[in-house]
Curated annotation (Swiss-Prot):
Its EC number is 2.8.1.8. Residues 1-23 are annotated as: Disordered. The keyword RNA-binding does not apply. This is Lipoyl synthase. [4Fe-4S] cluster 1 binds at residues 76, 81, 87, 316. It is found in: Cytoplasm. SMART domains: Elp3 (SM00729). Its main location: cytoplasm. It comes from Burkholderia thailandensis (strain ATCC 700388 / DSM 13276 / CCUG 48851 / CIP 106301 / E264). Its cofactor is [4Fe-4S] cluster. Pathway: Protein modification; protein lipoylation via endogenous pathway; protein N(6)-(lipoyl)lysine from octanoyl-[acyl-carrier-protein]: step 2/2. Belongs to the radical SAM superfamily. Lipoyl synthase family. Residues 87-305 form the Radical SAM core domain.
Length: 329
């Protein structure tokens, strides 16, 4: 068996080549994180990891065309989601607002890093117009991290929610937010103006792995965001998601689930982490379906109103069905 743990990491880009305004992906993005990624032997994907390839179906192409026409982004494309073919083919998408350059460098994520562009004042109207044109009954709106904004982007979320409700009143709205770190109280106050139907913020992984997987984020802060929002809006469902396969233990995942319930989170998603490229964190385990089933059973025992748990589950995958299962729609 080949041991790749001693393989030197690729050389960092020369300082003179660094352009903070450019969108950095893969090696360019992860080269500057505090904990370097050390390659390990790539695990063979088991038979239960099956992804439907993106196709050239008319609905798939229609959605991509409309998105480009309105200068919109989806996390499905930017984060290289494995379910993009199925979701686009069924006419669903998770819209990513505030640009396609994130101020964070999370090494599990394939969204590009860089100095963000100014907010697009037309984006809320373009987003709402697109949702109305596609006749979507349920949408997920997420964003890159915008640590450059005083409100973390909360005001832009509110503008998008208002425009969607104006142009497509029957559409239910889930927002998947960044952590608003350093500006949480301000962000929550702003969100009071137009709360969503579902408030989602992902913990992503267990606290022991935060420094490696989520540099710039804080586990306790993310829990506080969810709890504080729920205290302000007890009738709005709260939701969070986790990845497995990064080196966490079963007991650690169960403890995170207990932490979420202790912070009044209603809905849960758990899915298998898949490495976007060799420059991202490696997959350390492909979790067996029996373990996913155990997590699902434990989630309902703990009191979650809905738990979507499985290898190919993602936070916004079949979000409409998740919300329906939780009694939201």
């Amino acid at each position: 068996m080949t041991d790749l743990t001693a393989t030197p990491a690729p050389a960092e880009p020369a300082a003179s080549a660094y352009d903070p305004t450019a969108k950095q992906k893969a090696q360019a993005k992860t080269a500057r994180i505090p904990i370097k990624i050390v390659p390990i032997e790539k695990l063979k994907k088991p038979e239960w990891i099956r992804v439907k390839a993106a196709t050239g179906s008319s609905r798939f192409n229609e959605i991509k065309t409309i998105l480009r026409e309105h200068n919109l982004h989806t996390v499905c494309e930017e984060a290289s989601c494995p379910n993009i073919g199925e979701c686009f083919g069924k006419g669903t998408a998770t819209f990513m607002i505030m640009g396609d350059k994130c101020t964070r460098r999370c090494p599990f994520c394939d969204v590009g890093h860089g100095r963000p562009d100014p907010l697009d004042a037309d984006e809320p109207k373009n987003l709402a117009r697109t949702i109305a044109a596609l006749k979507l009954k349920y949408v997920v709106i997420t964003s890159v991290d915008r640590d450059d904004l005083r409100d973390g982007g909360a005001g832009h979320f509110v503008e998008c929610i208002r425009e969607v409700r104006e142009q497509s009143p029957a559409t239910r709205i889930e927002i998947l937010t960044p952590d608003f770190r350093g500006r949480l109280d301000r962000a929550l106050e702003i969100l009071n103006a137009a709360p969503p139907d579902v408030m989602n913020h992902n913990l992503e992984t267990v606290p022991r792995l935060y420094k490696e997987a989520r540099p710039g984020s804080d586990y306790a802060h993310s829990l506080k965001l969810l709890k504080d929002f729920k205290a302000l809006h007890p009738d709005v469902a709260t939701k969070s998601g986790l990845m497995v396969g990064l080196g966490e233990t079963t007991d650690e995942i169960l403890q995170v689930m207990r932490d979420l319930r202790a912070h009044d989170v209603d809905m849960l998603t758990i899915g298998q982490y898949l490495q976007p490229s060799e420059h991202h964190l490696p997959v350390r385990e492909y979790v067996h379906p029996d373990t996913f089933k155990m997590y699902e059973e434990e989630a309902y025992k703990m009191g979650f109103t809905h738990a979507a748990v499985g290898a190919m589950v993602r936070s916004s995958y079949h979000a409409d069905l998740q919300a329906h299962g939780a009694g939201v729609v």
